[in-house]
Amino acid sequence: MIPRTLAAGTLTLAAAGLLASAPRAQDVRRGAALFAETCAACHGADAKGDNGPNLTALWAAGATDDRVTQTIRGGIPGSVMPPSAATDEEIRAIVAYLRTLAAPPPAAGETARATPERPQRVVLVTASGEDIRGERRNEDAFSIQIEDDGGRLRGFLKKDLRDIVRGDAGRGVPARDRAGADPGIGYRDLLDGLKDPSRWLTFSGDYTGRRHSPLTHITRENVGRLAAEWTFQTGTVTRGRGFEATPLALDGVLYVTGSNDFAWALDARTGRPFWQYRRELPTDLTYGAMAPVNRGFGLLGDRLFMTTLDAHLLAFDRRTGRTSWDVTLADYRVGYSATVAPLVVDGKVIVGISGGEYPTRGFLDAYDPASGARIWRFYTVPAPGEPGSETWPAPEAAARGGGGTWMTGTYDPELNLLYWGTGNPNPDYYGDDRKGDNLYTNPLVAIDARTGVPKWHYQFTPHDTHDWDSNHVAVLADVTIGGAPRPSTGSGRTEPVEVRKVVMVANRNGFFYVFDRRDGTLLVGRPFTDTTWAREIGRDGRPIVLNDGTKSCVPDQWGGTNFNPPSFDPALSLFFVNARETCATFVPQAPKIAPGRQNFGGVVRVDREKAYGALRALDPATGERRWEFRYPSPSMAGVMTTASGLVFAGDNEGNVMAFDARTGANLWRYATGNPIWGAAPMTYLLDGRQHVVIASGATLLSFALPDRAGS
């Protein structure tokens, strides 16, 4: 049977010669008939999408004939699309037909939204009479985007301008030669985090990972008037995933990455692009084709930093979108990829790696932001003789032991410690050839930012056989702990009340943890979802395991939560997370291991009958639930809070919502039309108005109160 759901896909079949020549007319006719019979029910009669994604946009989004062919051949793990039993000729015919429906892809670096083909000098005359000279980057009937002669990207609404004078060819000088040029972002700016509410400079907004904004323009009283301000359609598609990036905001510009290694600089007022970047990717991607996502930029000076699906780290000039340097992290052909949003700390760009479903060895790297030279590397699976190597049975198991680092961590500048989670051991579900705890897979690791040496670690799921990566945002805060029995021990012993410097993690295994971030002391360890695999955390800090998953286990392989970011409101001292209530049976199988080949080591049978999702507020002092708001299905959306007492979240049904952080009462919702997968809201102040932005499907949406209503 030919599968019914298709999205941009994976490995090349060029060697098989399936698509070596131009499509023949008879192939197109046969492909149209096969598509109507087996694919149209999900993808629509015109292939523009129904329950399944739009297939006419695949090539414009960077897919190739080879990738689409392999997606049909192999299916999409974890989705309703199984591997296909179709013949090579049938697959070739379907791809040939789809190719006739596809628009041509944009050229590399080309902006897809009416960017002027030739540069044009302009003088913008503001309402106050100020002349702003620069080069036009984009324009529509209502707005214009320029790079001014100081090198700043600036967007204007035409209603706010007195005049636009065009063709000012001789009156400008190169931006870098002018006084008052954009000074860029320094380390001090990153340390300040969200003190300037017009900015959002890191993946989580600041180094703490709280995703908590000081803005109060949108309140419990007026959030019901929140309305869509603009949308930006990326035109990219993923394999049943979503648009997972968090934009960075600086001086009225949003910098955002997308699927298939696209990236844009957008006018934060209108969503119109100043520039677009598109990476030319190899056709034989491994993990990068399975999950062609990207989670965002890092920022320092006038440079942006981005990882790529073929496991590179790039530096861009943020004014132009042109690359400054390009370094290789690892060999993508083995199974490596990179999707993490880099974290820039003092003199270093910190990046992780993906590929734990392949025979890879995870690591975390630090690079010089000026040159791209590597400063240090921490391997998440130790070499023979190193601390932790005793938890692996043989060097060959450790050499392919997994432990990816694909979610952005957090940073305490006072302690100079990075807090980073790592992923599952490899193979995911089959553990017979890797007896032991398998360090450092599935822990939180506190790493010296200067040297890359781990200071302490805590392993959430020793010897994991459930694919419960610990790639979560670890949230830093100062929390009052004590005065009640410690939930991690259940001993009834009362602890003294004190304010502790903590790091908090809602883990994929269904437990919520609070540690002293200075030394890793476990303060709280308590389930925040139903769990059948473990009863509690024992006195030794290890889970008391009840069920290995082969007899139905809670949670499933996607976990009690996943990489979708949580949030923390320091005024309320509440931790907010989208929880998943799920169940599955894990069936381990010995895999065939080879470079570039996925090896999950089994299958998972998910019971969806009773599954649901919930936004939950947790007390970090005890781990107790304060309130919840339920969704009909598990959500993979992230969370954001604001100082006005609001929680913003999303769900799998495509709703972006606002809640009263104190009670969980729903105050506002907007139906985006696509599941919100992995993305979390962010917010910024512009022209005296607070904007809330979130990615949904392949679209970025911005919301604000009507003009002056929130000022």
Region locations from a protein language model:
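Extracytoplasmic electron-transfer domains, predominantly the class I c-type cytochrome c fold
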Residues: 41, 46-51, 55-176, 200, ...
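Aromatic (tryptophan-biased) beta-strands that constitute blades/sheets of beta-rich domains
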Residues: 181-238, 272-281, 285-286, 322-331, ...
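Repeat-blade elements of multi-bladed beta-propeller folds
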Residues: 200-204, 240-262, 287-313, 337-358, ...
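Structural recognition of the beta-propeller blade-terminating site
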Residues: 267, 317, 368, 448, ...
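Beta-propeller blade signature
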Residues: 363-373, 437-451, 519, 613-619
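Conserved blade-ending motifs and adjacent loop-strand segments that build the rim/top face
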Residues: 463-465, 470-473, 529-535, 541, ...
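Loop/turn-rich, solvent-exposed surfaces of beta-rich toroidal or solenoidal domains
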Residues: 581, 607-665
